[in-house]
Regions:
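Terminal leader/tail segments of proteins
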Residues: 2-144
Length: 144
């Protein structure tokens, strides 16, 4: 089994241990134990995050100079005024807050209490949807 995981990593796929750590990290970040992470159905160096039957977004792996990192992207189809309540309801976490960024009008920050989760950028000129962009470094996964 160890060889299978090593072979999978050598091919660029994600190992089961990596998927478990990513799941734990997303659960902790969003304060929601219902988040799941599984291998992407079409991309070998990616994973899909779900909440029950609902697709949340995609996690892409990147390796540079021997350091492996990940990028989570999630589309949120609501306007700015509804953003915080939508995310709190979706994840069942009233500690999620959407905060304006200094000197930036095209994006907001998403936090879980005092912890920064990521930046949400406006997708269209009417600001009717946002995309959460969240970098996940290998050190973020060390303590999960």
């Amino acid at each position: 089994v160890a060889n299978a995981a090593t072979d999978e990593a050598a091919r660029g796929g994600m190992e089961k241990a990596e998927l478990a750590k990513l799941r734990a990290h997303l659960r902790r970040s969003f304060g929601c134990d219902l988040i799941n992470v599984q291998p992407h159905s079409r991309k070998k160096d990616a994973a899909e995050a779900t909440l029950g039957e609902v697709g949340l977004g995609e996690i892409i792996a990147d390796e540079e100079d021997g350091d492996r990192s990940f990028f989570f992207e999630m589309k949120v189809p609501v306007e700015r005024a509804e953003l915080q309540s939508f995310l709190r309801k979706r994840f069942g976490n009233d500690k999620l807050t959407v905060v304006a960024r200094m000197k930036k009008t095209d994006s907001v920050e998403l936090n879980n209490g005092p912890d920064h989760i990521g930046v949400m950028t406006v997708d269209d000129a009417q600001a009717k949807s946002f995309t959460l962009e969240m970098a996940i470094l290998d050190i973020d996964l060390d303590d999960v």
